[in-house]
């Protein structure tokens, strides 16, 4: 069974009625992540040799392909803080809010497990592919990272100006200690399907918590600053700062890499360690993309149809459908057989189909008389 190794998403709760459209740019940002996800998976699935190397491949698959998963993980942290903001407006207690956040994380984890089961069944339910049922893909990672992040963030971080210092310290610990931990074998007493959630020590661990939970914690931390800025009417100014910091961080890391400044180096057992520089570059670019999303939606205004915003509002659905279209039996004859130019044309077609599907989900199924139970968190906000 062939499955993607890049990104997916979860749907973020909408802002409460008291702040219509204030965070609508996040939908656009999530839609941008969807576009990058489509091209990453399509180039990976359909590009033939000898084009799976060189500058084109490095840019399309390795560079741009590294962003969607991190963007969705960061957005998971943002969604957690938006959820807490809604909980605070409804007068929930700290325990009720954190419990609800953890249950949401477990719900997303359940989506991930159900998705693996569905993929296995659609691929023929082969016995040799049973281990694929336990592969830790991005939905699994997002779900568990939400559960963990709920331990570090709470209502106090949206009701007061107190920054989530413990979350920041934990993020740095994850970033700098993961390369060391990666050198360890996973615990022999722990079954491989469970060990795969820890770090990249098993074939099943595509998206282990170490280091990927750092992106969700980072999203929660940054979102707490954005929410405090909203309360003071200074969201644009704070976003300008976080965008600038992100850009400077990404540039500084790339400059350091070009000079050979590295804290950790590959080993025979860990060929691609989770460099702190990799985190710095990726999170810096994620912050830059957030600023661009805010600037673009502010410039265009909130009215009218937006393909990216529509994709962002139905990101979970388009993830599930596009994975089957790209990697499934429907396009099996195209796998690793197409020229990049033809793949690019098909990506445009795929994107159009996904925008249409998202529009149906949002504008027809999403209407109150056709409520779809994919986004219960929206109705509770």
Question: How would you name each of these model-derived features?
Answer:
Residues 2-381:
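Alpha-helical transmembrane segments and their immediate juxtamembrane cytosolic regions
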């Amino acid at each position: 069974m062939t499955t993607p190794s890049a990104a997916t998403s979860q749907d973020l709760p909408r802002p409460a009625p008291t702040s219509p459209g204030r965070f609508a740019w996040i939908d656009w940002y999530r839609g941008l992540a969807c576009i990058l996800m489509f091209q990453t998976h399509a180039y990976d699935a359909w590009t033939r040799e000898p084009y799976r190397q060189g500058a084109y491949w490095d840019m399309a698959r390795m560079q741009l392909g590294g962003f969607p998963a991190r963007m969705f993980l960061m957005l998971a942290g943002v969604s957690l803080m938006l959820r807490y903001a809604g909980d605070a407006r409804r007068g929930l207690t700290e325990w009720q809010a954190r419990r609800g956040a953890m249950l949401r994380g477990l719900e997303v984890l359940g989506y991930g497990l159900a998705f693996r089961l569905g993929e296995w069944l659609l691929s023929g339910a082969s016995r040799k592919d049973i281990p694929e049922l336990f592969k830790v893909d991005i939905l699994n990672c997002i779900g568990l990272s939400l559960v963990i992040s709920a331990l570090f963030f709470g209502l106090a971080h949206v009701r007061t100006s107190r920054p989530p210092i413990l979350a920041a310290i934990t993020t740095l610990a994850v970033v700098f200690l993961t390369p060391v931990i990666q050198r360890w074998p996973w615990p022999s007493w722990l079954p491989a399907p469970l060990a795969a959630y820890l770090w990249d020590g098993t074939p099943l661990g595509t998206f282990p918590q170490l280091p990927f939970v750092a992106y969700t914690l980072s999203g929660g931390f940054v979102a707490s600053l954005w929410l405090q800025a909203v309360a003071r009417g200074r969201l644009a100014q704070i976003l300008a700062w976080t965008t600038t910091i992100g850009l400077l961080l990404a540039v500084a890391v790339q400059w350091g890499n070009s000079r050979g400044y590295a804290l950790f180096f590959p080993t025979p057992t860990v060929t691609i360690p989770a460099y702190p520089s990799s985190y710095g570059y990726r999170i810096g670019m994620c912050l830059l993309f957030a600023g661009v999303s805010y600037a673009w939606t502010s410039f265009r205004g909130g009215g009218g149809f937006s393909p990216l915003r529509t994709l962002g509002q139905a990101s979970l659905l388009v993830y599930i459908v596009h994975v089957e279209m790209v990697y499934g039996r429907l396009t099996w004859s195209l796998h690793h057989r197409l020229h990049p130019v033809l793949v690019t044309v098909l990506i445009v077609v795929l994107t159009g189909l996904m925008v249409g599907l998202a529009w149906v989900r949002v504008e027809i199924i999403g209407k109150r008389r056709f409520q779809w139970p994919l986004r219960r968190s929206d109705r509770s906000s």
